[in-house]
Regions:
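Start-transfer (signal-anchor) and selected internal transmembrane alpha helices
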Residues: 1-70, 272-281, 440-448
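Membrane-embedded helix bundles of polyisoprenyl
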Residues: 57-60, 149-168, 173-260, 276-292, ...
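Membrane-interface coil-to-helix junctions
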Residues: 60-157, 180, 185-190, 196-203, ...
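Membrane-helix boundary/interfacial segments in multi-pass membrane proteins
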Residues: 77-81, 191-200, 311, 332-343, ...
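Membrane-interface helix-loop-helix junctions at transmembrane boundaries of multi-pass membrane enzymes
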Residues: 220, 262-275, 355-388, 428-439
Length: 619
């Protein structure tokens, strides 16, 4: 018998045996020590548990979007046909259209037509999601794809976090909590209502962490892991570069902490790590060499930050903000008409208190200590000095507040470990049959307190989301598809930045025309920085002046607009009365020198290749 036990012990995995020896000789930790992500391979998750997680997150997503799926028409109901939302709808339509019509998918002149076009990779073009949703777009239109993407993005992201949480808890409920916090955090909800698919399809971060842990515990095949990592990196690049950059920073922070805390573990796994990294680099390099060059140096690329870099504040993680329930905020202009909700980086005092008070139970677990360190460093990055961040290449385009994404993941994982540890502690304290009642009461208290920790966060949510019907003006629905190919459309108001409704109209009519202007990251006046950082002059500035304050148009503005219209022929100028500002019709007519015609609810000026403008009439 002794001989058999000795043989069995020799067959145990080295990492698990070493861990058991430490547990036997050292002070006993309070939590479930055997299940440590850095000390042993994760247990296999049963298939029904995956199905349960997907079902729970899908039910939550459907509840959030119930006004779309139960009270509206998914092909025509949307948060707003304006702002960022119209931009997202445009890209979902354009990428399949470009591929099916033989156009370059990396550079488009369908937007910012006559002005140089748009570098698709520089923008949030989501080529991978647009390709996956191509059948939906072809059958039901881009608004339907927008709604499907918003429905499924948190499900996929939450499920990935649920799988990762299996490294921190063996129980389903704590893992569901971790995935749920990641999938439905304020960061995710704020970006979901604006349709930022590049920021809500975030499965890449937990999956990369999972792959790294598999290599550290020597439970994964390095070549296969490298192939998976390389393939996922390619998909993520064509989904959202910003999440890819955030993941790289987060993993780098974690790697530094692992090296500092467990150098022997890293040395033991160095071979598999190098093999997997080399394979991943080869796969990603082969697929992304040209797209990365196009992103950094291709036509119409931009350098430096695309937004003014702004640091967050440390206390915002427990401060939901002043306009949580207000609908009259800047969020309306960006693309959401409902209540603003909590700050992007808010989590609430309850969740943080639950994690901190549970620290004595999980602090001896290496994986939990490392996750706490990564979460703390990511939180510090949210209020990193803005001027220093703006000087970093590539990373300067990442908004600092968006490091709330890894923070929410780390808090979710620690919360799962905390719930699991309390459950185990209660079981050890009242383990006999006679203690069943007390054990049940104590575990009921664990459940109640865990749920209560979410209250400060959940009370800031206003659900279901507010939606409206996507309105396409009659002229764009009926007349625009009959325009001759190559004709550009100039709208009044000028389609610029958040005045981007024409982008949605263009997408919802099958990209029947090229649009002058649009909402995209393009080079500004200096030809290097984004147009928001270096506002363009010339025709763009003149059209903005004509649209913004028609009653104060100067002769210089009129000359610039006329020169642009003459150079951009064939061109159709369209003014929708309900969207234009007072005096826009008179100012546009006086500037172009010819009267418009009324067609399908719009004033229209048509200039063919040889058409001439009439005499200008000063205002």
């Amino acid at each position: 018998m002794v001989q058999r036990l000795d043989v069995a012990r020799r067959r145990e995995p080295h990492t698990q045996r070493r861990h058991d020896e430490r547990a036997a000789t050292g002070p006993a930790p309070a939590g479930p020590v055997r299940h440590d992500a850095l000390l042993a391979p994760a247990p296999r998750t049963p298939g029904p548990h995956h199905v349960l997680a997907v079902a729970v997150y899908l039910a939550a997503a459907v509840a959030m979007w119930s006004h779309v799926w139960f009270g509206g028409d998914p092909a025509h109901t949307i948060t707003c046909n304006c702002g960022d939302t119209s931009q997202q709808v445009w890209w979902l339509e354009w990428f399949p259209w470009a591929l099916s019509h033989g156009h370059d998918p990396l550079l488009t002149n369908a937007m910012w037509a006559r002005l140089g076009g748009v570098n698709a990779i520089t923008n949030t073009s989501w080529m991978a999601p647009a390709a996956l949703l191509w059948p939906v777009t072809a059958l039901f239109g881009p608004v339907a794809s927008f709604n499907v993407a918003n429905l499924l993005a948190p499900v996929v992201s939450g499920w990935a976090a649920f799988v990762l949480a299996g490294r921190f808890s063996r129980r389903v409920a704590p893992r569901l909590v971790a995935g749920g916090l990641y999938a439905f955090s304020p960061f995710m909800l704020r970006n979901t209502v604006l349709g930022h698919i590049d920021l809500t399809v975030t499965a890449y971060l937990p999956v990369v962490v999972l792959l790294g842990l598999g290599l550290l515990t020597r439970g994964a095949r390095p070549v296969r892991t490298g192939l998976v990592l390389g393939g996922l990196s390619v998909l993520q690049f064509f989904t959202g570069v910003e999440v890819m950059a955030i993941t790289a920073v987060t993993v780098a922070l974690g790697a530094l902490l692992v090296v500092a805390r467990r150098p022997r573990l890293v040395r033991a796994a160095l071979g598999p790590l190098l093999v997997a990294g080399s394979v991943a680099a080869a796969v990603a390099g082969a697929c992304l060499a040209y797209p990365v060059w196009f992103f950094l140096h291709g036509p119409r690329h931009v350098q430096g930050p695309v937004w003014p870099v702004v640091s967050s504040a440390p206390w915002r993680i427990v401060d939901a903000g002043a306009n949580v329930y207000s609908t009259h905020t800047s969020l309306r202009a960006v693309g959401y008409l409902g209540p603003q909700g909590p700050s992007t980086d808010f989590l609430g005092f309850g969740l943080l208190a639950a994690v901190v008070l549970s620290a004595p139970l999980w602090r001896r677990r290496t994986s939990c200590a490392l996750v706490a360190g990564v979460g703390l460093l990511a939180w510090v990055l949210e209020f990193f000095p803005a001027r220093a961040w703006a000087s970093l290449p590539v990373l300067s385009s990442v908004e600092l507040v968006r490091f709330a994404l890894p923070v929410s993941l780390c808090v979710g994982l620690l919360l799962a470990a905390s719930i699991d540890a309390w459950w185990e502690a209660v079981g050890r304290r009242w383990r006999t049959v006679s203690d069943a009642a007390r054990r049940g009461a104590a575990r009921g208290a664990v459940v109640a307190l865990s749920a209560g920790a979410f209250v400060p966060l959940l009370v800031t949510y206003s659900l279901p989301f507010t939606v409206t019907t996507a309105r396409v003006p009659a002229w764009f629905a009926h007349d625009a598809p009959r325009l001759a190919r190559g004709t550009a459309v100039l709208t009044i108001p000028f389609a610029y930045a958040l005045e981007s409704q024409p982008m949605a109209w263009q997408a919802e009519t099958g990209d029947a025309f090229d649009l002058v202007g649009g909402w995209a990251f393009v080079p500004g006046a200096n030809g290097v920085d984004d147009e928001l950082m270096s506002p363009p002059g010339g025709a763009v500035a003149a059209l903005r002046a004509l649209s913004g304050d028609p009653r104060r148009v100067t002769p210089a503005v009129q000359r610039a607009v006329r020169a642009a219209v003459a150079a951009w022929r064939p061109l159709t100028v369209v003014l929708i009365p309900g969207d234009a500002r007072p005096g826009a019709l008179a100012a546009t007519t006086a500037t172009l020198g010819v009267p418009p015609r009324w067609s399908d609810g719009a004033w229209v000026w048509t200039f063919g290749p040889t058409s001439r403008l009439g005499p200008v009439h000063p205002l």
